[in-house]
């Protein structure tokens, strides 16, 4: 039995750089001198020598590899082990972020290059890997089975050496079968999707998508060089093989996941290169008269950036103050600065939400949602007696009822045949400033869906008084003024990103009191 060390000795002792064989086997504290103290006490001084450490795998020499391969030559050749070797990795240069990506770095280029490399691996290295990894862990087992299927069953362009590898492959392939564990089946499916769709050098969708607020775009030839059919094909094959053999609830994919739309390179290129033409609300009313028309016709994306540019141009023109005294011109300039500050408060949120969209599919979905809601609210406005105007979050009018057109003296074509903003109908600058101040309160954060306010709307200066409806006294009093004051209630309809998508404004005119009307 060894002597117990005192606390002072334990504090002053230093660990040996390498223990001897006896101390290593008995788990004793060895010393640096040879023979060590433990071996001298036990009369084993002549046998005291340093223990031989195991060499790391990457330090093994070629002769050592050759000897081990000679000793274990009876093990079958497994090309998948060579494929999963951690020491041989085909180098793929990653391009800079500001360079045009070559098509060889896109899609399944990594998988294609690795499929061509197994016949170039050293056979001794593969046999050594099969020796040391006789009991594979779960992840390696899943990857081996998946890659074995993909590389040797779904590849038609292999050369003669790859065919010989297929002939010598052992009969342990799973074919269309699955693992005995449901958890392994789930991991098999998830890892397969990661491998088949891994694009380490491809840019993210946020970089490749065309944003209206960012001028840095990818070269137009980039999307035309991507073969999207090759990207979708392996996923369909894997899901088709495992679709009928998974009796448990799928956590990664649904049954409809194999029916994903084909991402055609020509469609992507056309949608990103062709600018969106403006379609007036009067035209869209004829195109989408029912819900079936929305799903049968091609939805035309609404260009929100261009609408904001037109709004900015209108505000600058409205508040320019030309041919006005210096004081009034300065007051208009101050009102314009207030409006621009209000727009700048919620503009970053709108930009960040737009950048996360997958263009043009998300834009089409949002426009379909808008047109679908517009049909419902137009039907509701026909059943409601209050005059109604519906406009987008940019302020562009998309619908107006006939009774409000009659009050203001406009025709439907005057407002909906071109881009018309709700601010253009406002009589004074105070109403416009108040509009943006109220819109800011519901644009971001505050999810209140209604606003109650007063507003002045201007009437058509070229209106025909004989076309006005109502009593003679009411028509006369309305015709004498160039604007009408309304009590207005706004209902805000939001999209899937909680941004204001549509504003439904109901306007009740404040009529002048007659002789027999009591004022409270």
From Swiss-Prot:
It is found in: Nucleus. The keyword Nucleotide-binding does not apply. GO terms for molecular function: DNA-binding transcription factor activity, RNA polymerase II-specific; RNA polymerase II transcription regulatory region sequence-specific DNA binding; zinc ion binding. Gene3D superfamilies: Zn(2)-C6 fungal-type DNA-binding domain (4.10.240.10). Transmembrane segments: none annotated. Keywords: DNA-binding, Metal-binding, Nucleus, Transcription, Transcription regulation, Zinc. Signal peptide: none annotated. Transcription factor which regulates nonfermentable carbon utilization. This is Glucose starvation modulator protein 1. It comes from Scheffersomyces stipitis (strain ATCC 58785 / CBS 6054 / NBRC 10063 / NRRL Y-11545) (Yeast).
């Amino acid at each position: 039995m060894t002597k117990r060390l005192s606390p002072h000795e334990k504090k002053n002792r230093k660990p040996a750089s390498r223990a001897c064989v006896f101390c290593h086997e008995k788990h004793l504290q060895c010393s640096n001198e040879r023979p060590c103290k433990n071996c001298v006490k036990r009369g084993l001084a002549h046998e005291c020598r340093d223990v031989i450490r195991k060499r790391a795998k990457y330090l093994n020499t070629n002769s050592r590899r050759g000897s081990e391969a000679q000793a274990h030559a009876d093990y079958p050749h497994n090309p998948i082990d060579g494929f999963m070797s951690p020491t041989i990795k085909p180098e793929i240069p990653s391009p800079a972020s500001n360079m045009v990506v070559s098509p060889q770095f896109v899609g399944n280029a990594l998988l294609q290059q690795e499929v061509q490399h197994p016949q170039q691996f050293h056979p001794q290295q593969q046999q050594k890997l099969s020796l040391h990894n006789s009991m594979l862990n779960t992840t390696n087992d899943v990857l081996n089975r998946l890659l074995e299927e993909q590389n040797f069953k779904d590849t038609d362009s292999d050369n003669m050496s790859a065919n010989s590898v297929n002939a010598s492959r052992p009969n342990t392939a799973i074919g269309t079968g699955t693992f005995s564990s449901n958890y392994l089946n789930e991991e098999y499916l998830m890892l397969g999707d990661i491998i088949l769709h891994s694009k380490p050098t491809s840019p993210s969708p946020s970089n490749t998508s065309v944003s209206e607020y960012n001028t840095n775009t990818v070269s137009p030839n980039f999307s035309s060089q991507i073969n999207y059919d090759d990207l979708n094909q392996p996923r369909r094959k894997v899901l088709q093989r495992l679709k009928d053999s998974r009796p448990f609830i799928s956590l990664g994919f649904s049954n409809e996941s194999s029916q994903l739309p084909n991402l055609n390179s020509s469609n992507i290129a056309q949608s990103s290169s062709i600018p969106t033409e403006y379609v007036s609300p009067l035209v869209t009313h004829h195109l989408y008269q029912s819900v079936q028309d929305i799903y049968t016709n091609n939805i035309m994306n609404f260009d929100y950036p261009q609408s904001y540019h037109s709004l900015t141009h209108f505000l600058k023109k409205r508040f320019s103050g030309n041919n006005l005294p210096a004081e009034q011109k300065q007051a208009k300039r101050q009102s314009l600065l207030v409006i621009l500050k209000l727009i700048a408060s919620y503009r970053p949120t709108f930009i960040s939400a737009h950048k996360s969209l997958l263009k043009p599919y998300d834009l089409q979905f949002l426009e379909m949602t808008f047109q679908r809601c517009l049909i419902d609210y137009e039907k509701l406005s026909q059943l409601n007696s209050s005059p109604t105007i519906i406009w987008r979050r940019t302020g562009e009018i998309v619908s107006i009822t006939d009774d409000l057109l009659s009050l203001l003296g406009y025709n439907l074509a005057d407002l909906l045949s071109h881009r018309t903003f709700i601010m253009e109908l406002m009589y004074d600058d105070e109403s416009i400033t108040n509009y943006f101040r109220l819109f800011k309160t519901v644009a971001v954060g505050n999810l209140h869906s209604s606003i109650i306010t007063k507003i002045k709307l201007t009437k058509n200066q070229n209106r025909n008084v004989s076309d006005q409806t109502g009593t003679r006294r009411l028509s006369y009093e309305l015709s004498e003024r160039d604007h009408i004051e309304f009590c207005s209630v706004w209902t805000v309809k939001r999209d899937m990103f909680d941004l204001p998508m549509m504003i439904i404004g109901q306007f009740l005119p404040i009529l002048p009191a007659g002789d027999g009307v009591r004022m409270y």
